[in-house]
Regions:
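Non-catalytic pre-domain segments flanking phosphatase-related domains
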Residues: 2-23, 27-76, 98, 102-104, ...
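C-terminal cap/substrate-recognition subdomain and adjoining C-terminal extension
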Residues: 3, 31-40, 44-50, 54, ...
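Generic macromolecular interface patches on structured domains
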Residues: 26, 59-63, 88, 103, ...
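N-terminal low-complexity, Ser/Thr- and acidic-residue-enriched intrinsically disordered segments
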Residues: 27, 76, 84-87, 93
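Short, solvent-exposed loop/turn elements at domain surfaces
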Residues: 58-60, 81-83, 225-226
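Asp-based phosphoryl-transfer active-site loop
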Residues: 70-85, 275
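A metal-dependent, Asp-based hydrolase signature
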Residues: 86, 91-170, 174
C-alpha cells in the first residue's frame, strides 16, 4: 500500500514521540532517587534509619508494620534543638520574670524571683529544680492556653541564643528534621515527647518541626476551666499536673497515643525509659540517642564516652553501655552529621 509523504511524516513523528517517552522513562529508572537524609554522613546511624523504614513499610517484609501502628517519638531538648547552656524554656521563663513581678509586685522580695530581678548570678547558680519549677510555673500561670502560646511565639521571634546569636527556633538539628520528614513520608506519625512544657512546645512545634499540637506530649501544669465574660476559657494554674520525664515518658506516651512506638529518639538519661519501652516490643524497633561530641560545631558533653559532665542533658556512661547492649544506635554529631543546622 502506497502512503503519502504526509502520512509517512505523521508516522515518523509518532514513532519519534514514542521513542522519546521510552527513553525518558528509562532515564528516570536509571536516575538515583533523591537522598532523603542529605545532612547525614554515610554510616551505621544513617543506615539504621533507612533500613528500619524499608523493612517496616515493605508489605512483603516479615517485619512490615501496618500504617496505623507506625509511630515514632522524639525528645526535643538536645535531640531536636540545642539545649545548652540552659533549656530554652528556662531562658524563656527567666526573661518572663520581670513581667510576672510587674503583675505581682510582692514576688520581687521572694526567692527565687528576687535573685532574677536583682541579677544575682551567684544565687541563680544555686537554683534547685524546685526553684526553676516555680519560675517556669509563674511564667504561664493565669494566662489562657491561647494567650500563653502567643507570649511564647513573641519571645521566640526575638530571643537569641547566647552562643549562636540566632533565634532558638533556628537552632534545630537539620539531620533530625530530615529524619522526621522521612518517617512521615513513609506513613509514620511523629510525636514530640519532651520533658519540657507541653504548651510551650505546642506554640511552635508545627511551624518548626511540622508536628501539630495534638502530637506534642510534655510536662503539664494544672489547667482550670472557667467562663470569662461569657467565653469558655482554659487557664494555666501555678501547680504541676504531670512531669513527662524519665519514667513519666512511657506513661505520657500511653496516656496520649495509646500504643507503643516503633521508633524513639532521645539524647539523655531522661529518655532512657522511653527507649526501653519502645524497643521492648515485638517486631522491628529503632532506638537512637544523640551524643553531643562536637564542641566546634555545637557542644560536647556527656559524661558518656569520656566527654565533659553536664547537669543539662546528662548522658551517663551507664546509658551509653545500655545502648550498646540493647542494640540502640548512638548518633555521633561529630561523625554522623554532615551539617548540624540548616544554616551551616
Amino acid at each position: 500500500m502506497n502512503r503519502s509523504p504526509t502520512a509517512i511524516l505523521q508516522i515518523s513523528r509518532r514513532a519519534a514521540l514514542a521513542l522519546t517517552v521510552a527513553l525518558l522513562g528509562a532515564c528516570a529508572q536509571m536516575a538515583p532517587a533523591p537522598d532523603p537524609l542529605p545532612s547525614w554522613n554515610e554510616g551505621p546511624a544513617k543506615d539504621a534509619i533507612v533500613q528500619f523504614v524499608r523493612k517496616t513499610t515493605d508489605s512483603a517484609s516479615p517485619q512490615f508494620v501496618p500504617p496505623a501502628q507506625r509511630v515514632a517519638t522524639f525528645d526535643q531538648d538536645g535531640t531536636l534543638w540545642v539545649e545548652q547552656p540552659m533549656y530554652a524554656q528556662v531562658a524563656f521563663a527567666l526573661d518572663r520574670v520581670k513581667d510576672v513581678v510587674k503583675a505581682q509586685p510582692a514576688l520581687a522580695n521572694e526567692e527565687p524571683f528576687k535573685a532574677v530581678v536583682t541579677g544575682d548570678r551567684a544565687a541563680m547558680a544555686r537554683f534547685t529544680e524546685g526553684d526553676l519549677l516555680k519560675i517556669v510555673g509563674a511564667s504561664q500561670a493565669g494566662l489562657s492556653i491561647e494567650a500563653f502560646r502567643e507570649v511564647v511565639k513573641a519571645w521566640a521571634a526575638t530571643a537569641k541564643h547566647p552562643k549562636f546569636q540566632r533565634p532558638y527556633t533556628e537552632l534545630v538539628y537539620a539531620p533530625m528534621v530530615e529524619a522526621m520528614k522521612y518517617l512521615r513520608a513513609n506513613g509514620y506519625r511523629t510525636y514530640i515527647v519532651t520533658g519540657g512544657g507541653q504548651e510551650f512546645v505546642r506554640a511552635f512545634a508545627d511551624a518548626v518541626y511540622g508536628v501539630p499540637p495534638e502530637q506534642v506530649i510534655g510536662s503539664m501544669l494544672k489547667v482550670d476551666y472557667s467562663v470569662r465574660n461569657g467565653v469558655p476559657t482554659m487557664t494555666n494554674a501555678p501547680a504541676v499536673f504531670f512531669i513527662n520525664d524519665k519514667a513519666g515518658k512511657p506513661v505520657g506516651i500511653n496516656m496520649v497515643i495509646g500504643q507503643r512506638p516503633q521508633a524513639a529518639f532521645g539524647n539523655s538519661d531522661g529518655d532512657q525509659q522511653m527507649l526501653e519501652w519502645t524497643t521492648g516490643g515485638a517486631g522491628a524497633r529503632l532506638g537512637m540517642l544523640v551524643l553531643h561530641d562536637d564542641a566546634q560545631r555545637e557542644y560536647a558533653y556527656g559524661p558518656a564516652a569520656g566527654l565533659p559532665a553536664s547537669h543539662v542533658g546528662t548522658f551517663a556512661q551507664s546509658l551509653y553501655d545500655e545502648a550498646k547492649a540493647k542494640g540502640w544506635t548512638v548518633i555521633s554529631i561529630k561523625n554522623d552529621w554532615k551539617r548540624v543546622f540548616a544554616f551551616d
